[in-house]
Amino acid sequence: LNAIKEGFFGVMPVIIVGSLFLLFTSIPINGYSEFMTGLLGENWSQIFMVPYRMSYGIMSIYVVVGIARSLAHFYKVDTRESIVVSFIAIFMLTPVLVTEDGLKGLPLDNFSASGLFLAIITTCLAVEIFRFVVQKGWTIKLPDSVPQNVAKPFEALIPVAIIFIIFNFVRIGFEMTSFKSAQNFIFTMLQQPLQSIGSTLPATILVLLIESILWIFGLHGSSIVSSVMNPIWRSLSAENAAAIGLGKAATHIINYQFIANFVKLGGTAATLGLALVIVFTAKSSRYKALGKLSLIPSLFNINEPLIFGMPIVLNPIMAIPFVIANITMAIVTYASTYIGLVPVSIGVEVPWTTPPIISGFLIGGWRVALWQFVMIVVSFVIYLPFIKKIDTLELNKENQK
């Protein structure tokens, strides 16, 4: 799971830049489309769609590289060969498309969001097999006098051959089924059901509840939850982006941007509101100092100073608003999006440290930025009575001293 998470982190620049190109095709400003048509012609959007398709549109390819590299470092095996065997595996399982004119090729759609789960599973299996073969010593050993740049390719011959053989049999096996390919099997039996569950409000509430409880007990809830859920949420974002690219409407309300830019305003459980409550209302010396320390990091969605400095960890009083805020952000935003107050995210991604309001405008215009402000106010109200309680207790202790 950590390799998958690190693999996604490694391709973040590609995803962010690609989503920004998509943003340029649909900037939410009146008259923008007409202006661009007059400036660049009727097909002006294609100027931005090609970079989008070569980044976000084939994100599975970049994820393969990221995960293979991360696994290679963890297992201490050759990084380059790990990436190579991963691509061998994924290409072996990708069906060849034959056009009416007899042209053959690999459809790019198989490397988009729809191929994400196959890419993740295949990469993990390929590197695992490669590691097993190498660590068992099933390689061709050349004398030490042979230069490493010559010996290395020979050492990889047997592992690479085994990867080819195994995944060729896997390919043949799937072709004998009604699914016809591993791609169709994974998408139908695994990715679609997980996306269907992950895009529902009840499942999201459950995930956020688990995340909150993990944090309360001192575990990094965001890392644990994101390693499982981020591939699902990102694939939903990618499908929204693909729909926009085809001129259709984005349909997945819950996606990566929903979580990152509405639920986590200031960090898990929208703790920017908590930081603001402390700054504006705290009277005790302890919490005044904490407010000054935590506000700037919170503006960039970093809330560890609050979680461990307040602390929220193992704090029964602060655990209550922490859980309530995390879930409330999701419920209220989902309802507002469902009735049309807030637009559905089109899949544009910005760095997770982008401050709220700015991130909202970048991913969806002034309506999203305004909604982020509203959600910060809501979180402020949720945390306010609890901060007043613990601040009063702390102030009494300080006065007794």
Give the ranges of each region predicted by the language model.
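Generic multipass alpha-helical transmembrane bundles of integral membrane proteins
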Residues: 162-182, 186-281
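Alpha-helical transmembrane segments in multi-pass membrane proteins
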Residues: 17, 60, 64, 68, ...
